[in-house]
Every structure is written in structure tokens, then in C-alpha cells.
Amino acid sequence: MQPGGQFDMQQLLAQAQQMQEAVMQAQAEIAATEVEGQAGGGLVKATIKATGEVQALTIDPKVVDPEDVEGLQDLVIGAINDAMARAQQLAAERLGPLAGGGSMPGLPGF
């Protein structure tokens, strides 16, 4: 604050710019990160980008049973859902401090 209780707009704008740059950098890092999820004790693995794009799907031949296609489908869905949950957790951990947990010094309620 400036003398007389005035806010220093230049300082506030600089802080906002720094926060925006930090968020953009964190978003870029998250988008480039790949996360692996698994199901069936690791017999089915899904690798996704943190943005949600599936990159790879690995299925151990042990779980391929022509008589139990539904079981394999469940494992694939489970592996993808596990990877998505991990990606969401990663994003929350990296963006959490930048998104809403912080405050703007000198501004009440922020």
C-alpha cells in the first residue's frame, strides 16, 4: 500500500502478471506429463497425457480370454479411469497453490 492507504496498482498488476505466468507454466508442464494407470494388479495399463489423451494401452496376454471379453473391457476401463484420476490429482497438486489457495497481499478478501 502507498501512504494514505492507497493500493499500488503497478505492484498489483505485476503480481497478477507473475501469477498468470506461473499458472501458464504449470499448465504447460501438466499438459506434457504422461500418467500411468493400471487395473488387474498391473495386467492392464493405460498411459495418458495429463490432458486426458490416451497415449498407450498395454494388455498382458494372461487376461485375454475370448470367453470373458466383458472382464477385459472392465479392466481396460478401470486402467483408464485410474490414469485419469492420477492426472486430475497431479493437476490439483500443481495448480492448487496457484489457483485458489493463495491470496493477494494488500487486498481484503483475496
From Swiss-Prot:
Domain of life according to the entry: Bacteria
Pfam families listed in its UniProt record: YbaB_DNA_bd (PF02575)
One Gene Ontology cellular component: cytosol
GO molecular function: DNA binding
UniProt entry keywords in alphabetical sequence: Cytoplasm, DNA-binding
Entry-linked SUPFAM superfamilies: YbaB-like
Subcellular location: Cytoplasm, Nucleoid
HAMAP family (alphabetical): DNA_YbaB_EbfC
Subunit (UniProt): Homodimer.
Biological function: Binds to DNA and alters its conformation. May be involved in regulation of gene expression, nucleoid organization and DNA protection.
PANTHER family in alphabetical order: NUCLEOID-ASSOCIATED PROTEIN YBAB
Annotated family: Belongs to the YbaB/EbfC family.
Protein name in the entry: Nucleoid-associated protein NFA_2940
